[in-house]
Amino acid sequence: KKKIHTWGLEINRVTLPNITEKFMNNLPGAEDELENTATALRIFAEAGVPIARQRLAGDTFPQLMTRYQSVHRGGYVSRGESRALTRGELETPNYDELQEWWNRFCDIYSTLVPIAEECGIKLAIHPSDVPNPDTPLGGLGFHRVIDAFPSRSVGYLYCVGTRAESGGSSIVMDEIHNYGRKGRIFMIHLRNVRASLATAEAFEEVLLDDGDMNMFKVLLELQKIGFDGCLNPDHIPNIEGGSSGLAYSIGYIRALLAALAAMP
């Protein structure tokens, strides 16, 4: 943290140690994983980090998707995912398996949430990416999380791109309004995509100005609900020249913020 401060920066969010299949399937050593992540949460809170994210095994169904490289304007390359291209028998967890996953999730949050409340750090959940139907942290899943854990320390690392993969820009605007007015959006992953699982059984990640969403409208909606957290450019496409994609994304976000500030 001290080194980051020497560069004039602040830590906005950290990722806790992963909860793997070992814990989610209740295998030997499972409790060690939970103890490890609980200890890490306390340490980050003591260091003054405001937000922590917990990643969990089993919240996506990668076997349903075929990944490919998509090429876009000027030759830049990005991730594409297609359900339509996937061949063979596609198995997903049944109801009992999904319920067991949820029970294990509740075990984790029942441990972490009291620590977060005591230590003054927020727990931010990222939606399931790819958001296939019945993924545990999809559109219904997050409602389930905040119903089970109504603490103000529990909220969303809201990923605009992931949720657009589910059903386009309309779902993003609705969810920002819904979760934002409840104070549940702690941080934003800002990413644009083309198509969605609902419209094409596929999607492709693109630069912020090159997808289906109007990112200015997204920021305008965030302003309306009073969001004042961090905007994180996410899954940056590869532009020839190393860090050019990151520079382009940051520059574009700064331009959007300047335009927003100039509005009467």
Question: Model-flagged regions — what are they?
Answer:
Residues 105, 123-129:
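Short, structured patches in soluble enzyme cores that scaffold and shape functional sites
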